[in-house]
Amino acid sequence: TAVTTGSGLVTLAVPSSLNSAMEAKTTEVMTVPLSDRNGRISAGAIDEILKRVDKADTVLIGPGLGRCDDVSEVVESVLEYSKVPVIIDADGINAVAENMKALSSCTCPVIFTPHTVEMSRLTGLEREYIEDNRLVTAKEFAEENGVTLILKGHHTIVTGQDGEQYINITGNSGLATGGSGDVLAGTVASLVSRGINETVASAMAVYIHGLAGDIAKDKYGIESVTASKVMECIP
């Protein structure tokens, strides 16, 4: 998605055991094989990852990582080291939720992209409370932690660390499909890498993602919307 939305160069860090398959599948991006354990990136890859972070304009971490101690160590190391914006999605969110202190040593701009369940893990709040108090919950989390927050759901809410909020009007229930969040995360990373303010870039990405979902719904029918079709329909 980052390539589709304008990134000139995208590098995908993958477990070495999966590198050949990913090279064959992703023709538009470069892959970097990393030391792994049981098919997941291991803590032994941290030095190589940080070298790559030095060369990046933006880092997206989380999609497909899985949940284990090594992954948590990788995520925490990237947060502590990075000087460029870091987008934390999927299993990256789970890793931070297990150790919120990881944010205290972080000096780079951070963007979280949780859905309600992930937001519950981050905050310790009940899902029902979050769903009934989305604006307040998002604002408090963003301000208290000094981050940008994309709280996904019906009318996704984007909140900046200063409390500024945007409510998105695009999108439909067809976007609640596997991989759709990864499409959004890649779009956020692409726009942030251009130097656009993190909150504005996040709001733009959410709007584009929702609009692509609406185009896909009109083209294929809501029951047939998939992540790949959403990416295909990005205007």
Regions found by a protein language model. Give the residues of each.
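Small-residue (G/A/S/T)-rich helix-start motifs and N-terminal tracts that mark the onset
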Residues: 1-87, 94-111, 116-235
